[in-house]
From Swiss-Prot:
InterPro entries: QueA, QueA_dom1, QueA_dom2, QueA_sf
Subunit relationships: Monomer.
Key word S-adenosyl-L-methionine present: yes
UniProt GO molecular function: S-adenosylmethionine:tRNA ribosyltransferase-isomerase activity
Entry's Gene Ontology BP terms: queuosine biosynthetic process; tRNA wobble guanine modification
EC number(s) reported in the record: 2.4.99.17
Top EC class, one word: transferase
Keyword Oxidoreductase among UniProt keywords: no
Entry keyword set: Cytoplasm, Queuosine biosynthesis, S-adenosyl-L-methionine, Transferase
Protein name: S-adenosylmethionine:tRNA ribosyltransferase-isomerase
Gene designation per UniProt: queA
Protein source organism: Clostridium perfringens (strain SM101 / Type A)
Amino acid sequence: MKVSDFYFELPEELIAQYPLEKRDSSRLMVLDKKTGEIEHRKFHDILEYLNEGDTLVLNNTRVLPARLIGEKEETGGKIEFLLLKRIEGDKWECLAKPGRKAKVGTVFTFGEGKLKAIVREIGEEGNRIIEFKYDGIFEQVLDELGQMPLPPYIHEKLEDKERYQTVYSKEKGSAAAPTAGLHFTEDLLKEIKDKGVNIAYLTLHVGLGTFRPVKVDDVNNHVMHSEYYHLDKENAELINKTKEAGKRVIAVGTTSSRTLETIGDENGRVREQSGWTDIFIYPGYKFKIVDNLITNFHLPESTLIMLVSALAGQDNIMNAYNTAVKEKYRFFSFGDSMFIK
């Protein structure tokens, strides 16, 4: 299977540069994975497609303001760090721009010295391991000095930081938002619960590998980045009861899907578990837990379009995406939504 099999022509003006004023006013394409039939709705209409006893699985990760702009302590030369993941304590793996300035032992300062970073080592891919020095609580310092790490295809400034967070975000640790969840409002979640639909939570901290292009020709040769996940006992039991009752598990986002499929066993059960996953889901994969999926519209030739193709069928997805382009749906992080039923 070739990566080019997942290519489609996307006009740049369809890449959403800002979120809509109302989260649940985005468009919703409903795709029947059995027939390939397409409906055009509004996101709030998702309520009509959820049944009593179903379980909606949300990723409650919270995006860190992981972009730090500072200067070299000795010379004042500008540097930009993008935090990727915490290694341990105050040590973080990050991207440095320009990399040539970030030599081992170099000290950088941020916010007039409120935060300092020392480069401890350089990784295989050129990523830096840095150690922070500061007074107080790191998360508070980062909230004050850090900026939101918006995806590379968004060029507009984000006026409100919270619009790149889901309304249920809780566990800090992501370098990017689980964007399928951006469409939900607190009112809509209440309406969903009132209908008798269960809501389960898990955590997967989204890494920047999400935006890395696939650099091989053959899909089988691609190696995924690893991301940290956690599912607790209470939510695992809720998901298992749903499967036992013959009801549907509906994942919100590719991150929730990858977590559930990492943990799920051959009998369609999950258990309390934490760890790192590098699961790569593409056509031919048999889903163990996820029945349906709410997701955004993804980049051509990305691992995410491969995942949705595994669930809905490659022909169905490519047809749906070409229809979305024709109907001028908004794409990517701040774009419209798809429900694979």
